[in-house]
Amino acid sequence: MSVAQPRLLFAASGTGGHVFPALAVAEALPEAKIDWLGVPDRLETQLVGDRYPLHTIRVGGFQGSWLLRPLTALRLIGAIFKVRRLLKRQQIEAVFTTGGYIAGPAIAAAWSLGIPVVLHESNALPGKTTRLLSRFCRRVALGFAEAGEYLPGRPLQVVGTPLRSQFYQPSQHGLPIPENVPVLLVMGGSQGAVAINRLVRAAAPAWLAAGLWIVHLTGQQDPDRGQLQHPQYIELSFVDNVAPLLNRADFSISRAGAGSLAELAAAGLPSLLIPYPFAAEDHQTFNARIFAKAGAAILAPQSELTVEQLQQQILDLLRARLGAAIANPLPKMAAAAGKLHVADSAEQVANLLRSLL
């Protein structure tokens, strides 16, 4: 690694699944000067600007026959040239990206200038951008080993999905939950999940009557917020650090984004996973299958799940925790979840970047 302060460009944009792992890696590189490449009006504009210089470009994805669409192609070419100018102006030595739309111009621009790129793919099914452009990257870091099946011949390293340092720092959830009661944590991902919210609210009365406490992270765009009122039901639109809630909960209902799964694994929390059915190429189902196969979770496709089924599944899984004299399946699931955790993921990716400087 060069003696001078290394200069890096992080290209991560859109959802928490792209931005949060990149922030975790950035935290693991305190010696570096990091510039950030994003898109206007996306999550990174809220999270990154106070920490790193943020540069934004407008860019779309590789959806459909984009080469046949002159306007899309021109925008992409324009974005590549803008990133090239940024790389030269900031004297960038290496680029890190977490995939998604922003990765296209970032990888292309860096490759054209001979600047090495590390790409992190968090999902078990790599995205289209990753499959197309990973051949131009010096290293490809994987959240799941299974993703390597779709990337033959690439310079791969399985590192898990990085979590921000605050996830591992002791803190209190600050909620008025009694010490020994069973707690169900419902998470819809960084963008929320209206379908899950409605299923949970419809099923909740039976859970509450049985003695379960529910902490429901609804997302900020939930149209039904406030409709369910109960002393044991706590509704939050967003929390910056979910770790204290994960550590307090007995079980979780969650989407199956790679970031959420990494958090569940880190906390050793068993779960029922409802993959987002409209995710690109249904990639959340691929993620969920790995957790289900390991015994860490139950996979429940949204299209097949009724309120009655969800209600009964949760009651059955938590029956021992609710006081029934039966075997408790949760400790075995929790142990399986914990085995999927990679504690030094961010440091591994940081070391990949250091090795290229």
UniProtKB/Swiss-Prot annotation:
UniProt keyword annotations, A-Z: Cell cycle, Cell division, Cell inner membrane, Cell membrane, Cell shape, Cell wall biogenesis/degradation, Glycosyltransferase, Membrane, Peptidoglycan synthesis, Transferase
Principal EC category: transferase
Catalysed reactions listed for this entry: di-trans,octa-cis-undecaprenyl diphospho-N-acetyl-alpha-D-muramoyl-L-alanyl-D-glutamyl-meso-2,6-diaminopimeloyl-D-alanyl-D-alanine + UDP-N-acetyl-alpha-D-glucosamine = di-trans,octa-cis-undecaprenyl diphospho-[N-acetyl-alpha-D-glucosaminyl-(1->4)]-N-acetyl-alpha-D-muramoyl-L-alanyl-D-glutamyl-meso-2,6-diaminopimeloyl-D-alanyl-D-alanine + UDP + H(+)
Biological or metabolic pathway of the protein: Cell wall biogenesis; peptidoglycan biosynthesis
Main subcellular location: membrane
Binding site for UDP-N-acetyl-alpha-D-glucosamine: T15, G16, G17, N123, R164, S190, Q284
Membrane protein topology class: Peripheral membrane protein
Location(s) in or outside the cell: Cell inner membrane
Gene Ontology terms: cellular component: plasma membrane
InterPro entries tied to this protein: GlcNAc_MurG, Glyco_trans_28_C, GlycoTrans_28_N
Enzyme Commission designation: 2.4.1.227
GO terms, molecular function: UDP-N-acetyl-D-glucosamine:N-acetylmuramoyl-L-alanyl-D-glutamyl-meso-2,6-diaminopimelyl-D-alanyl-D-alanine-diphosphoundecaprenol 4-beta-N-acetylglucosaminlytransferase activity; undecaprenyldiphospho-muramoylpentapeptide beta-N-acetylglucosaminyltransferase activity
Domain of life: Bacteria
Annotated GO biological process: carbohydrate metabolic process; cell division; cell wall organization; lipid glycosylation; peptidoglycan biosynthetic process; regulation of cell shape
Signal peptide (UniProt feature, chain positions): none
The protein's role, per its UniProt record: Cell wall formation. Catalyzes the transfer of a GlcNAc subunit on undecaprenyl-pyrophosphoryl-MurNAc-pentapeptide (lipid intermediate I) to form undecaprenyl-pyrophosphoryl-MurNAc-(pentapeptide)GlcNAc (lipid intermediate II).
UniProt record similarity statement: Belongs to the glycosyltransferase 28 family. MurG subfamily.
Listed NCBIfam families: murG
Protein name according to UniProt: UDP-N-acetylglucosamine--N-acetylmuramyl-(pentapeptide) pyrophosphoryl-undecaprenol N-acetylglucosamine transferase
The organism of origin for this protein: Synechococcus elongatus (strain ATCC 33912 / PCC 7942 / FACHB-805) (Anacystis nidulans R2)
